[in-house]
Amino acid sequence: MKKMKIKPPFFEVGPKAYFCGERAVELGRVAQAASEETGVSVIYTPQLTDLALVSREVKGLYLCAQHMDPIPMGKGQGSILPEAVK
């Protein structure tokens, strides 16, 4: 996993559960454009189910999962493994 080194100033966009799917991608594109225009780094935290989609469609943002569980693979129904959000 690539380590992130974010230098200030930065801005975080956390859409919570207001956007999903293509709307989450659109918001990511707006954040990317703002980052390029201002030179300010943007951390974007879409819903976990949109993380891979946004990663493929939008470049230039620091993407972070909203949540993960610090557990090893195995039992843990409903848990989010660290390996799943790489």
PLM segments and residue spans:
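Conserved N-terminal beta1-alpha1 strand-loop-helix module at the mouth
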Residues: K2-Q77
